[in-house]
Each structure stands twice: as structure tokens, then as C-alpha cells.
Amino acid sequence: MAQQEMVTINAELRDVKKKKAMQALREKGSIPAVIYGKGHDNVNLTLSAKEFTKQYKSGALSAHLIELDISGKKEYALVRDIQWHVVKDTVQHVDFQFVDKGSEIKIDIPLSFINESKSPGIKLGGVLNVLCRSITVKCSPEKIPQVIEIDLSGKMIGQSIHINDVKLPEGVKFVAHEEENFTIVTISAADSDVEETQTKTEE
């Protein structure tokens, strides 16, 4: 599981806070933003709407450590919230969280299901039921994985993969879940197979 590459976003300090002033920024192609975090003062920013939207659509901002270049001063951050215009589907505001290198953070990491072609259950027509598409982990910023791979090799119809079956990279830990060993994915028989089995049983 490869560690993710750093994403860089350019930002500038923002003095204006009033609603009309921020709307004027948007009309000029900028996005109002803020960065905050424990032990840090809130800092108001502006971003290039074109640059940020391009990074977002490429998937580069999902669970990624970001290097914010704030008028030449570099800070590490995570995207914590994005507000969208309900009609235009454009970004209206972005919340970042400061990240201190060396400290551990909680972050949701997407799951990637690999080796479907090596699953006998899927080859026999089984259906892959994904119950969980991301999991929360705790690690230092430099250890954040791009994805966590779930290997389907050898899995038969009726088998499941649970959280305790997943191997994490060194330095990455699962965050406790209310259900200790929850199910991530199962391989079930197709409906037609189930109906056929039921018919044979009734006969």
C-alpha cells in the first residue's frame, strides 16, 4: 500500500469577512477559506477556484495531506469541509485543519477491492456486497496511505472479510469502532442461484 503523494495548493491571506465582500471574491474566481486547529489561531484565506476545483475533481484532495502555500509560508493541512452552491454546483467555502508533522491524526481512508478475478466465488457468479467503502485510521501525516487494499483472492460464495482480516501499513492503526470486528465485504449467491436452490429443496 503506497503512501500518498503531497498535494500543494496556493492560498493568500484574506482580510475581508463580510458576506458581500466574500461574494465579490467568488465573482472574481476566488474561494473564501479558513484553516484552523488545536493550538493555532484561525486564519482566513482565499484560493483559486480554478485550481482547487481541478484538484478536487481529480480526486487528489480526498484523504490527502495538503501543503498549503500561504503567501509563501507553507503549512500542512487536511480538507475538513467543502460548502457547495446548491444550484450552480460550485465551491463556496473550504475548511482546512492544521496538521503538525510528527503528531497523529484521525482520517478516513478509501478502500480498494483487488483481485476480483482471483475470487472463485465471483467467477461462479457470486455478487460482491460492499458494506464499507472507507475506514478511519490514526497515524502521523507522513504515514497516511493512499488507499487500503482489500484482497479478494480465494474468496468463495458465502465468505466475508472483516476489519480484523485487513493488514495495515506499519505505523497505521484502526480507530475503535462500535462494532469491534465489523464486516467490510461479503460474496453472496446471485438471486437466481438462491431461487434455484430453494426450488430444488422444495421438490
UniProtKB/Swiss-Prot annotation:
Gene3D superfamilies: Ribosomal protein L25, beta domain, Ribosomal Protein L25, Chain P
Domain of life: Bacteria
Pfam families reported in the protein's UniProt record: Ribosomal_L25p, Ribosomal_TL5_C
SUPFAM superfamilies: Ribosomal protein L25-like
InterPro entries, per the entry: Rbsml_bL25/Gln-tRNA_synth_N, Ribosomal_bL25/Gln-tRNA_synth, Ribosomal_bL25_b-dom, Ribosomal_bL25_C, Ribosomal_bL25_long, Ribosomal_L25_dom, Ribosomal_uL5_bac-type
Keyword annotations from UniProtKB, A to Z: Ribonucleoprotein, Ribosomal protein, RNA-binding, rRNA-binding
Free-text function comment from the UniProt entry: This is one of the proteins that binds to the 5S RNA in the ribosome where it forms part of the central protuberance.
PANTHER family: RIBOSOMAL PROTEIN L25/GLN-TRNA SYNTHETASE, ANTI-CODON-BINDING DOMAIN-CONTAINING PROTEIN, RIBOSOMAL PROTEIN L25_GLN-TRNA SYNTHETASE, ANTI-CODON-BINDING DOMAIN-CONTAINING PROTEIN
Membership in a protein family: Belongs to the bacterial ribosomal protein bL25 family. CTC subfamily.
Subunit structure: Part of the 50S ribosomal subunit; part of the 5S rRNA/L5/L18/L25 subcomplex. Contacts the 5S rRNA. Binds to the 5S rRNA independently of L5 and L18.
Protein name: Large ribosomal subunit protein bL25
Taxonomy of the source species: Bacteria, Pseudomonadati, Pseudomonadota, Alphaproteobacteria, Rickettsiales
